[in-house]
Amino acid sequence: MTENVYTFSMIKPEAVQNNLTGEILSEIESNGFKIIKLRKISMSYEQAQGFYESLREMPFYEELCKYMSSGSVIAMVLEKENAVKDFRELIGATNPAEARIGTIRRKYGLSKSQNAIHGSDSDESAERECRFFDL
């Protein structure tokens, strides 16, 4: 992947279950991102553990893995210049209550863990996360 052009995103289980996928995808596209690849996935608990390996020592790790394996997610590769930075700005802070008004997490997130969407935090993470899901 070319740096600064691609990022990885994942619509989380509660947003998929609450039928917010279409609204979130529209918002992503209307902010200049092109959806290059998209796949609906049901992660096993073990897959969630692998995806969040870097958070293994955190106190919320087990709960996060249970949650992320509780339903389908939408994994996708997005394209735009400065993709990682711009997408992080679009989705907002991890905690929806602290996210800027107008961001995806502020609009659709329920809590710090059930915050509707994941976005890579670096070009390296984006590449690793895309590879993890064979995207």
Give the location of each predicted region.
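Non-catalytic terminal and connector segments of soluble metabolic enzymes
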Residues: M1-L135
